[in-house]
């Protein structure tokens, strides 16, 4: 059975390992990178089905990386995962082209659901943020 290929971008090793394990139940995590520039490069090289990216990364952040990726591939399916729930950042992430916005402290089933939604072309925002 085909498992969608997911690229993970997270600069904290412990968090990356936790997210990789969580995503690995439903998806094939093809690579994990630690910054936005590496994310853009890996996206071009690996052509994943979906991308899960932290916002706070060194150099190019997750929102800027989303803009760069979507400029090159308007169909890219990107879910941002972050500790930041401010409406300004949610709006910026979605405006950049992300289909999902999930808070790290609620990541779990919600992150998996967000990736599935993104793969189907649907938007998903953490329930805690009150936007869907």
Feature locations, PLM:
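Two-component/phosphorelay signaling modules centered on CheY-like receiver
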Residues: 12-31
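Acidic catalytic/metal-coordinating carboxylates
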Residues: 35-38, 58-64
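Short amphipathic alpha-helix used as the core "switch/output" element in two-component signaling
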Residues: 41, 63-75
